[in-house]
């Protein structure tokens, strides 16, 4: 009975570690997918004031 409990505990422990590693890998993949969108937002934030100032100077306002 004691050997069975040790085996089950070991399986549970290894399964928990495996699940944790899978979640970390999935989170890393999601972060990699999110990066281009964040870059686009950063480019828009930098580009919009420049375009706005250019239009103001061209229109003379």
From Swiss-Prot:
Q: Which residues form the signal peptide?
A: 1-22
Family matches, as InterPro entries? Frog_antimicrobial_propeptide
| Keywords recorded for this protein, A-Z | Amidation, Amphibian defense peptide, Antibiotic, Antimicrobial, Antiviral protein, Cleavage on pair of basic residues, Fungicide, Immunity, Innate immunity, Lipid-binding, Membrane, Pharmaceutical, Secreted, Signal, Target cell cytoplasm, Target cell membrane, Target membrane
Q: A GO CC term? A: extracellular region
Q: How is it used?
A: Has potential application in preventing device infection by S.epidermidis biofilm, since it has the ability, in combination with EDTA, to eradicate S.epidermidis biofilms on silicone catheters.
**Is the Membrane keyword given for this protein?**
yes
Q: Name one GO molecular function term.
A: lipid binding
Query: Where in or outside the cell?
Result: Secreted; Target cell membrane; Target cell, Target cell cytoplasm
A GO BP entry: regulation of defense response to virus
Q: Which residues carry this modification: Leucine amide?
A: 59
Q: Kindly state the subunit structure of this protein.
A: Homo-oligomerizes in membranes as homodimers, homotrimers, or even homotetramers. Oligomerizes in presence of LPS. In Gram-positive bacterial mimetic membranes, the aggregation is weakly pronounced, and penetration proceeds more rapidly and is deeper than in Gram-negative bacterial mimetic membranes where aggregation is high. Homo-oligomerization is prevented by temporin-L.
**Into which family does the record put it?**
Belongs to the frog skin active peptide (FSAP) family. Temporin subfamily.
* Protein role: Amphipathic alpha-helical antimicrobial peptide with potent activity against Gram-positive bacteria, weak activity against Gram-negative bacteria, and moderate activity against fungi. Mainly acts by causing membrane permeabilization, but is unable to forme pore-like openings. Is also able to penetrate eukaryotic cells (keratinocytes), and kill intracellular S.aureus (both wild-type and MRSA) without injuring host cells. Shows inhibitory effect on biofilm formation of Gram-positive bacteria, but not of Gram-negative bacteria.
Q: What is this protein called?
A: Temporin-1Tb
């Amino acid at each position: 009975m004691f050997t069975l409990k040790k085996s089950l505990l070991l399986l549970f422990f290894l399964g928990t570690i495996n699940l944790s590693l899978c979640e970390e890998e999935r989170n890393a993949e999601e972060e990699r997918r999110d990066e281009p969108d964040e870059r686009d937002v950063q480019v828009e934030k930098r580009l919009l004031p420049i375009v706005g100032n250019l239009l103001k100077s061209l229109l003379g306002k």
